[in-house]
Amino acid sequence: GKIVNGSKIILSTTKDNDNQMLYIMPPLDQNIKEGLYGKSGLMYKGNGGSYLNYYQIGTGKKHLFLNFSIHGFEDSYDKDGAELTYMANEFWKYLKDNMSEELIQEWTVYILPVSNPDGQYNGWTNQGPGRTTVYSWAPENEGIDMNRCFPVGWTKLNSSRNYTGEQPLQAYEAEALREFILTNVGNENFVIDVHGWLNETIGNNELGSFYRDEFGISNHIGTYGKGYFIQWARSIPNTKSMLLELPEVKSHNELMQKGYVNKFNTATMNLLKSY
């Protein structure tokens, strides 16, 4: 395809793979881009899998990263991480129609709608592959819990539900997520990792307050977790991070009836307007 002004080119290498990947995604318009930042474990295995995709809007020096479905299975029903991806895609549609020129100039927003696609699409349990990735470069290629495997506070965990491998970042998808964030840091950075369904916020209290207000969440935990994505993210200079645990739903219909999409959109827009 044609390389146009504003196209994004990403070169990446990953463990056990010497091939560089070149992604060229022409911008949809001057301020809106969609692209790829890596491959899932099953793609490295050569058995299906998915590219890791992102959406981007804005040109500002304040950067907001919204990550969804780091666990393809949460703990309500099979493949319920898909609800988080649905919310991500709906927020992307909303931003394209509602982000003001002022916010576009102040902010760059990155949305990662499904950072563990193998878990969501090919997994089978919330106690192992599904919650975790399906294929990693850990011993026996066992699936990794991406939200326990980041380098800051990393702890070796052996259960299938929370397996962290023999060292940090043995999930291909976690490596790619880390590199994507580091490649795209701004002057100020805000990282939000969206989960279900524990009805609480974790990490930065101020960031959490926007979502507690909209969702009626009463509980906040001020620590950042061992090996959590937000624990690593806050080690980046000038970065605030927060994990959002949405209140539980039992179906897509319930999520729709309770207005989760609108609540999330409102909370995030309030955040953008407040900083």
Regions found by a protein language model. Give the residues of each.
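OB-fold/S1-family single-stranded nucleic acid-binding modules
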Residues: 12-31
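Active-site-adjacent mobile loop/cap segments within catalytic or ligand-binding domains
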Residues: 15-16, 191, 200-214, 222-275
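Short beta-strand-to-loop junctions in surface cap/lid or active-site-entrance loops
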Residues: 52-62, 69-70
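Extracellular/periplasmic catalytic domains that process cell-envelope and extracellular macromolecules
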Residues: 3, 45-48, 56-60, 102-105, ...
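Active-site/substrate-binding loop(s) of hydrolase catalytic cores
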Residues: 73-222, 248
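A non-catalytic alpha/beta surface segment that caps or lines the substrate-entry region
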Residues: 27-54
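Short nucleic-acid-contacting surface segments enriched for D/E, G, S/T with interspersed K/R
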Residues: 1-9
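Alpha-helical scaffolding within the catalytic cores
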Residues: 49-52, 129-132, 177, 224-233
